[in-house]
A protein has these predicted regions:
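Gly/Ala-rich beta-loop-alpha elbow adjacent to hydrolase catalytic centers
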Residues: 508-513
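Serine residues within intrinsically disordered or low-complexity segments
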Residues: 4, 23, 35-38, 60
Length: 755
């Protein structure tokens, strides 16, 4: 750049005042009259100049791209030599090691990349902001900049004090949110003080003693290297703990195996993309908040200072929350519309007289949603049960109660529907609370029907039609509905002569377990007794259950007789009449997650020797990092394949047959039990194939019809008539043969007994 003419001095954003960084001719200047406040934010040089955080003083003529390109290295240098930024980068580099800690379940490479990105971005933001606050506190008077000796002393005090406080609070960090927050804050101060001390020490050595000019190479690269060294220490400590306490489920890695350069490149890209996205969101929020602050000051005619900044962030936060709520509602509405669509695999109402929507039913086929239609169309027939059990069987009853009407009206409809289907003539009635989308595990329903030899009635009262994550606000209604249905059925059963009265049970899995179990949240097991509930089975009880939390804190308060039993697998359950059996896997994140894990250590993350099986002993609980990993454990809780049962996470298919026998005291011989297990797997695989084939074929025919319509030709069906001079295409012939061999198309939508 030239040297003639008036010159304008550039500035850095270091805390405490204006520091000259470069000097350029005024006609090439973009930013003028800018300074920073005590935490490194842009601020006006005086009252009436620029507003906080806004780029003022745009000069004319507008700079060319070439001039801007010459300024970029200076701006980058200004950014990367800022102590707060450097502390943030060091914290971000260190956070990579905790990001690779083992959780309850393995993560995919793509998920691991997102974990790294979120952790790095979060630790950067927290580290930079905390060090800026420490620097401001050390400087004392606004506008004053602390010297390097004072900053080193501040780093030593905050780092050492934070370390001592963290050590003192650690044993009780899981006792309450107050102690957890204090412990997490102390840990943050300790690591930030250490990082700040390393940054200031490297500054003194590189720039004062050696005399190097500040640059990216003498600042940021050193900081990242120091962060990596801290990460190495974390990994070393983790390995020492593993050797001391042993590896739990050593075959379960933190991340599923990664193969190939392309896979690693994908991970790197996702990591950078995640961090970039979060950073862009933060910058956008900051920019919006500063613009709002300028508007507020124009309206009031006065500078609002920190109050204005705070109000602006509050307004921006409220706006983001409103957008999130609107987006959530859009997702909910879209899901509801999807739930109303009739699937190709289940196109017509059932023909069975013992299921809802059949000839004897009071329920309309389009009123029960996708999962309800699947449920009634997949019911077993007496002959199918006989084929597996080798004993005479009857057709079981399945009733689905739609969510239209009041709770009392739905309870009355449940009784009327059972009457119409012959449910009160069965020996076992189970009120099964579904998940949010209306789903009741098909494996559970079929296992019950096999074990009862068809002499059973399943009632499903629907309280929502959206995935469980979107139905959390419907669980109170679901619990009220469950209790009302149980009470209405119990009253009807009391009118039956004692010798012919069916036994009443309840069942719930996942969110359904929360809904069913929470009937006992007020009144305990005694309330279930008052509703004539003989016993209950609850698979994968979520952490949100009120009854679960009460029972966990004080078991006698809700269950003085000890009839609520918790086991990780059903073969460990005792033989107790009237038992309410909770089966929860040791590695089920749906049960072990907690919103407070952001800072508070959960009970199962205690001393290594006290942790439940399947919980890694070498992993330390860390604020933020452990919470992010737990979120991905939730996402991976239901990774399962049709027909392949495994005791893992939130998948309880492998436990259901035995759990039903233990809780409801149903019987089977070893040979029958094996036959049931085989049939459950075969039917699940068959139905999954049926849905896939029907959906794919339906889409294919729809695409063909669209094309033929454009050609002016008639639409086609699944039948392909062979002509003398035209053979059926080999691919089509193969598809039709596969469907014929497996009898898939013949079973789609079937619900009545075989002809």
């Amino acid at each position: 750049m030239g040297t003639s003419g008036p010159r304008q001095r550039g500035i850095t954003t270091r805390a405490g005042g204006v520091v000259e960084l470069y000097s350029i001719p005024t006609d090439q200047c973009i930013l003028t009259h800018m300074s920073t406040d005590s935490v490194g934010r842009f601020a006006g040089a005086g009252r009436g100049n620029t507003r906080p955080g806004l780029l003022r003083g745009m000069m004319s003529p507008m700079p060319s791209l070439a001039r801007i390109s010459r300024l970029i290295p200076q701006v980058v240098s200004q950014f990367t030599t800022d102590p707060a930024v450097r502390v943030g980068f060091m914290q971000a580099a260190w956070s990579v090691a905790p990001s690779f800690a083992r959780g309850l379940l393995p993560r995919t490479p793509a998920q691991q990349a997102i974990v790294v990105g979120i952790n790095a971005t979060s630790h950067y933001a927290i580290g930079a902001t905390t060090w800026a606050g420490i620097s401001s506190a050390v400087a004392g008077i606004p506008g004053r900049r602390a010297g390097w000796k004072a900053l080193l002393a501040g780093a030593a005090v905050t780092g050492g004090g934070g370390f001592l406080a963290e050590r003192a609070l650690r044993p009780r960090s899981g006792d309450s949110m107050a102690l957890a927050s204090a412990w997490a804050g102390s840990k943050l101060l300790a690591t930030t003080g250490l990082a700040g001390g390393l940054v200031m020490t490297s500054d003194v050595v590189a720039h004062r003693l050696i005399g190097r000019t500040p640059s990216v190479g003498t600042t940021l690269l050193i900081d990242v290297a120091a962060g990596c060294a801290m990460a190495g220490g974390t990994l070393f400590r983790r390995n020492l703990r593993a050797k001391r306490y042993g590896w739990v489920s050593e075959d379960r890695r933190a991340v599923d195996s990664v193969k190939g350069v392309r896979a690693y490149a994908t991970i790197a890209g996702i990591t950078v993309g995640t961090a970039t996205g979060i950073t862009a969101l933060a910058i956008g929020e900051q920019t919006t908040a500063r613009a709002i602050n300028v508007g507020l000051e124009k309206v009031t005619g006065d500078e609002l200072g920190e109050t204005g900044i705070w109000l602006s962030h509050m307004v921006t936060g409220a706006g983001l929350a409103a957008l999130a709520l609107v987006g959530l509602d859009k997702v909910r509405q879209r899901t509801l519309r999807t739930n109303e669509v009739v699937e190709p695999a289940y196109p017509s109402p059932p023909t069975s007289e013992t299921v809802s929507c059949g000839p004897n039913s009071l329920i309309e086929f389009d009123a029960i949603g996708k999962e309800g239609r699947r449920f009634v169309l997949m019911a077993l027939h007496g002959q199918q049960i006989t084929n597996v059990m080798g004993e005479a069987a009857v057709d079981p009853v399945r009733a689905v109660i739609p969510r239209d009407g009041t709770i009392q009206e739905r309870a009355e409809l449940a009784v009327a529907e059972l009457e119409a289907l012959g449910g009160f003539e069965r020996s076992v009635i189970v009120v099964a609370s579904p998940t949010g989308v209306g789903y009741v595990n098909y494996v559970m329903a079929e296992a019950l029907e096999y074990l009862a030899r068809g002499n059973s009635a399943l009632v499903v009262p629907q309280y929502a039609m959206v995935p469980s994550a979107l139905a959390l606000d419907k669980t109170t209604e679901g619990t009220e509905l469950q209790a009302e249905v149980l009470g209405a059925i119990a009253q009807r059963i009391r009118r039956i002569p004692p010798a012919r009265r069916p036994r009443l049970y309840q069942f719930g899995e996942s969110l359904g377990a929360q809904v069913a179990l929470d009937v006992a949240a007020i009144g305990g097991v005694a309330r279930l007794d008052s509703l004539d509930v003989t016993a209950g089975l609850y698979m994968g009880v979520p952490f949100r259950s009120r009854a679960w939390r009460t029972w966990w804190r004080n078991r006698r308060a809700i269950d003085p007789e000890g009839r609520m039993v918790l086991v990780p697998q059903p073969d460990e359950a005792p033989e107790i009449p009237g038992m309410h059996l909770m089966v929860v896997h040791d590695d089920d994140p749906v049960n072990k997650f907690a919103y407070t894990m952001f800072v508070r250590r959960p009970w199962w993350f205690g001393a290594p020797e006290t942790r439940p099986p399947m919980v890694p002993r070498e992993t330390l609980f860390r604020p933020i990092s452990s919470f992010v990993i737990a979120l991905f454990d939730l996402l991976n809780a239901m990774n399962q394949k049709p027909g392949a049962f495994a005791r893992r996470g939130h998948d309880y298919r492998i436990d259901l047959r035995e759990a039903l026998q233990k809780a409801y005291r149903l019987t089977s011989s070893p040979t029958q039990a094996e036959a049931i297990e085989n049939a459950l797997r075969e039917r699940e695989q068959m139905w999954a194939e049926a849905r896939l084939v029907a959906k794919t074929a339906y889409k294919a025919v729809a695409t063909i019809n669209d094309t033929l319509n454009k050609w002016g030709r008639n639409a086609v069906s699944m039948d392909f008539v062979e002509q003398e001079d035209i053979d059926i295409p080999p691919a089509w012939r193969k598809l039709m043969k596969q469907m014929s061999d497996s009898q898939l198309m013949g079973r789609l939508g079937s619900s009545g007994p075989p002809a």
